Amino acid sequence: MSFFAVLLALVIEQFKPLPRKNRVLEALQSWIAWSARNFDAGQSRHAWVVWLMAVVVPTLLTAIVYNALRHYRVLLALALNVGLLYLTLGFRQFSHHFTAIRDALDRGDEHEARRLLAEWQDMDAVDLPRTELLRHVIEHSLLAAHRHVFGVFFWFVVLSALGLGPAGAVFYRMAYLTSRFVAARLQGSEGMGHETLMDLSNRLFVKLDHVPARLTAFGFAVVGNFEEAVNGWRRDAPLWKHANEGIKIGRAHV
């Protein structure tokens, strides 16, 4: 059932991709913000409570609902699998950005390519030379592919094998959203509580992304130059704030 769920979700997403900003994402961000606002009181244990509320509670609810549906009617469980995978596997949420930039470069329109990159990543790309432009496009595309596809798929498979259905996909997506949302929205806030929450959410996401990141890099290495990929991992991992990102990018530079 897991295979068909992934296949159906990807097919649906090809024909009806979710926009980058959508109501589901807004609802999840509101849930994370509510958890932080109501449970983060400035101490380490409060940061744990926020993370458990924001990430683990939706994961447990997904597992409970899935198992209830599976015992009642298998098709309903399959529908839940497909629906949640559709919401968490966001291949088309970033692929059109890459395609548009690639097409602009193929036309020789570097100005348009820079504009599209700046729009995609909210960065200043006006003065980027062509080599740097290409590097940024490759890096961001690879990271997006991992976060929207490979990482979600890994945790879906792991927890699905344990009988928890799409709980793994929800787990990875909520952990990623929590780490990014907290860093983006609370970084400038006063109080040590927010800093503690940011540190915890980032640290936990790095840990749960440890294996998927290396599997993603290994997969690219298999179809490329394995020896150069390993050297790239060793060279680039220490240069990034999160080593997982450096490992994936190290493969992209090969």
Predicted features and spans:
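Hydrophobic N-terminal alpha-helices or hydrophobic patches in metabolic proteins across all domains
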Residues: 1-253
